[in-house]
A protein has these predicted regions:
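Receiver (REC) domain active-site loop signature in two-component systems and cognate sites
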Residues: 56
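Active-site residues of response regulator receiver
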Residues: 53, 81
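Acidic catalytic/metal-coordinating carboxylates
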Residues: 33-34, 59-64, 84
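Short amphipathic alpha-helix used as the core "switch/output" element in two-component signaling
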Residues: 40, 62-73, 91
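Short, conserved "switch-loop" micro-motifs in signal-transduction and mechanochemical regulators
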Residues: 71, 83-84
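Active-site beta3 strand of CheY-like receiver
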Residues: 45-51
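Two-component/phosphorelay signaling modules centered on CheY-like receiver
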Residues: 12-30
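Short hydrophobic/Thr-rich beta-strand motif most characteristic of the beta2 strand and flanking loop
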Residues: 26-33, 41, 59
Length: 95
C-alpha cells in the first residue's frame, strides 16, 4: 500500500525538495501552494499525512489545521516554518 503526503507550502523550492525527498522513500506526494488550493481538493476520504507551512499568504497553516479539525479531519499533521519561535510552537501543539 502506497503512503501519501499532502504538502501545503507557499515556497515552491520547499515543496519541490520535500516532494523529491518523500518520493525517493516511496511516499506519493501532492503539493499545494496555498491552504485554499488544498481545501479545494480535500475530502474526508483522504489517507496519509499533511505537512503544513505555518506562515503563508492568505490562510496560515494553523488556521487551515483548525478548519480541518472542525471538518472532522483525523490525518496527522506536521508543521514546518522558517520563522518559528517557542510560543508559536506551543500554540500549534496545544491544538
Amino acid at each position: 500500500m502506497t503512503q501519501h503526503a499532502y504538502l501545503v507550502d507557499d515556497d515552491e523550492a520547499i515543496r519541490d525538495s520535500l516532494t523529491w525527498l518523500l518520493e525517493s522513500r516511496g511516499v506519493a506526494c501532492a503539493s499545494y501552494p496555498s491552504a485554499e488550493d488544498f481545501l479545494a481538493t480535500w475530502d474526508s476520504s483522504l489517507a496519509g499525512c499533511i505537512v503544513l507551512d505555518i506562515r503563508m499568504d492568505g490562510m496560515s497553516g494553523p488556521e487551515l489545521f483548525e478548519l480541518l479539525c472542525e471538518r472532522g479531519c483525523k490525518l496527522p499533521v506536521i508543521f514546518l516554518t522558517g520563522h518559528g519561535d517557542v510560543p508559536m510552537a506551543v500554540s500549534a501543539l496545544k491544538k
